[in-house]
Amino acid sequence: PEAVTAWARAQGVNAMRVDRDTNRLLRDFYRLGEGPLTEAFETAAKADPSLLGKGSRPDAAFDADPRDTASPAAMATLLTRMFAGKALSPESTKVFTAIMERCRTGTARLPGQMPPGTTVAHKTGTIGGTVNDVGMVSLPGGNGVVIAAYVKASASPVADRERAIAEIARTVRDYFLFAN
């Protein structure tokens, strides 16, 4: 994790930090013990069935934790550099973009209200009251616009949070399409 934060800093992105791997982040969120993650979760959920719905409910302590955070501006700056080939080698930029274009989660988020044929290269994040999506939306003519949309500490249904992201993304896309 420290190496990722250092790399982001080298890209000029300071409002981003990576402190834990995904395994540790999930263990901290669900307050799980050691051992294989799936087994630890299943054991904890048997003892406390409310854990099964925790993944879509806000957790004030978790939301206030400064670890593993990035401001939307920091994320957008990093993604702009990455998609433009300024942060990775040309080959790695192609691989990165292809991976982001294959994202199958969050179809109701950044891509949710895009016109048919619009390429959206994105990555979602969901935990507790946080629902987000970051990536690049293609524009006709070969350009694109990077969007980092976060909904944090929300008790609204996930579908409502996703719709907010989709509406923002479509508005941003249309603005850049028609303003240029």
Feature locations, PLM:
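Structured C-terminal helix/loop/strand segments within mature extracytoplasmic catalytic/sensor domains
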Residues: A60, A64-N180
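Active-site-adjacent helix/loop patches that line small-molecule binding or acyl-intermediate pockets
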Residues: P1-S56, A70-A74
